[in-house]
Amino acid sequence: MNSKQCVVIAIAGASASGKSLIAKTIYEELCRDLGTDQIGVIAEDAYYRDQGHLSMDERVLTNYDHPKALDHELLCQHLQALKDGNPVDIPVYSYTEHTRTDEKVNLTPKKVIILEGILLLTDPALRDQMDASVFMDTPLDICFMRRLSRDVAERGRTMESVMSQYTETVRPMFLQFIEPSKQYADIIVPRGGKNRIATDILKARIQHLLAK
């Protein structure tokens, strides 16, 4: 599989803006069209840096909403490897331990790679790997309520810790890094991941790129 046979689509935006939902929808619908072995999804947060050398007290202070928290260089290397026809081993990150685990997820080359993450559009080298990009333009207050429910239910967080993180890092980093990166998106999607028209437009773009 050469680079022209691998289409990379990026879905960016605030935490809990609907990125995973639209990525899941596109993945499932493209699987029906192309086959389940031809589509792959990579979550940017798998590439949070390993912090095994730090104490737990130090790890919990990590600003997950700053670009420096992510190993975008490794993500770029993995995307290029997939385009070159080589499999990659994607890291697995633990939010309870605040570091990478010893596990890896093997991903083989695909016709379509869907990236989803909050800071994808902030990195020029990463943008160069993309064939099309989307920014989920969901109101920040809605994102916060979704994030609060998710982190308490799925990530073992307390309501107080989620609220503190939001005011100290999530909102400031959104305004400093994530929202300005919207200018680099090819498609801006309002109303979250259930925007059917935006989903259809993105699918049509993917099909067009595959037909080249």
From Swiss-Prot:
<dbReference type="GO" id="GO:0004849">
    <property type="term" value="F:uridine kinase activity"/>
</dbReference>
<comment type="pathway">
    <text>Pyrimidine metabolism; CTP biosynthesis via salvage pathway; CTP from cytidine: step 1/3.</text>
</comment>
<dbReference type="InterPro" id="IPR006083">
    <property type="entry name" value="PRK/URK"/>
</dbReference>
<dbReference type="InterPro" id="IPR026008">
    <property type="entry name" value="Uridine_kinase"/>
</dbReference>
<dbReference type="GO" id="GO:0044211">
    <property type="term" value="P:CTP salvage"/>
</dbReference>
<keyword id="KW-0963">Cytoplasm</keyword>
<comment type="similarity">
    <text>Belongs to the uridine kinase family.</text>
</comment>
<feature type="binding site">
    <location>
        <begin position="13"/>
        <end position="20"/>
    </location>
    <ligand>
        <name>ATP</name>
    </ligand>
</feature>
<dbReference type="InterPro" id="IPR000764">
    <property type="entry name" value="Uridine_kinase-like"/>
</dbReference>
<dbReference type="GO" id="GO:0005524">
    <property type="term" value="F:ATP binding"/>
</dbReference>
<dbReference type="InterPro" id="IPR027417">
    <property type="entry name" value="P-loop_NTPase"/>
</dbReference>
<keyword id="KW-0418">Kinase</keyword>
<protein>
    <recommendedName>
        <fullName>Uridine kinase</fullName>
        <ecNumber>2.7.1.48</ecNumber>
    </recommendedName>
</protein>
<dbReference type="GO" id="GO:0044206">
    <property type="term" value="P:UMP salvage"/>
</dbReference>
<comment type="pathway">
    <text>Pyrimidine metabolism; UMP biosynthesis via salvage pathway; UMP from uridine: step 1/1.</text>
</comment>
<keyword id="KW-0547">Nucleotide-binding</keyword>
<dbReference type="Pfam" id="PF00485">
    <property type="entry name" value="PRK"/>
</dbReference>
<keyword id="KW-0808">Transferase</keyword>
<dbReference type="GO" id="GO:0043771">
    <property type="term" value="F:cytidine kinase activity"/>
</dbReference>
<keyword id="KW-0067">ATP-binding</keyword>
<dbReference type="GO" id="GO:0005737">
    <property type="term" value="C:cytoplasm"/>
</dbReference>
